[in-house]
Amino acid sequence: MQASRSPDDLVKTFKSILKEERFGSQSEIVNALQAEGFSNINQSKVSRMLSKFGAVRTRNAKQEMVYCLPAELGVPTAGSPLKNLVLDVDHNQSMIVVRTSPGAAQLIARLLDSIGKPEGILGTIAGDDTIFICPSSIHSIEDTLETVKSLFNYAD
């Protein structure tokens, strides 16, 4: 086992491990980090690191649920413009769907709810990275769609 490793080494190794997209549990990450010489690592610290770096659980190529750091994710900071968190805006005849960076949907939905009916939004439902927008009227869904797109400077 190696002598004490620096916090920078831990972060670098942690990110490298997550890029492998093969660890489905925090205990597996703990074991991998311990095998790399970080003897003082535990599940609690791994949990905090996963949160700090914006890790998400997703399916890998083998359809296994694993932790990863998606490239497009850039963890939002206090100075991040909200428009950077909106990845896609689409619609059908009755609903508008907004896809966001993981973890940003509820924040964006709250903003959309606050502008509400005057802008054609009856309400929203948000998950982790997807928002369903119910327009005030399906007859004006195109106008509501344009309002949402302009709010986030989104262009097709």
From Swiss-Prot:
It comes from Shewanella pealeana (strain ATCC 700345 / ANG-SQ1). Pathway: Amino-acid biosynthesis; L-arginine biosynthesis [regulation]. SUPFAM superfamilies: C-terminal domain of arginine repressor, Winged helix' DNA-binding domain. It is found in: Cytoplasm. GO terms for molecular function: arginine binding; DNA binding; DNA-binding transcription factor activity. Its main location: cytoplasm. Signal peptide: none annotated. This is Arginine repressor. Regulates arginine biosynthesis genes. Gene3D superfamilies: 3.30.1360.40, Winged helix-like DNA-binding domain superfamily/Winged helix DNA-binding domain (1.10.10.10). InterPro entries: Arg_repress, Arg_repress_C, Arg_repress_C_sf, Arg_repress_DNA-bd, WH-like_DNA-bd_sf, WH_DNA-bd_sf. GO terms for biological process: L-arginine biosynthetic process; protein complex oligomerization; regulation of arginine biosynthetic process. Keywords: Amino-acid biosynthesis, Arginine biosynthesis, Cytoplasm, DNA-binding, Repressor, Transcription, Transcription regulation. Belongs to the ArgR family. One of its GO terms (cellular component) is cytoplasm.
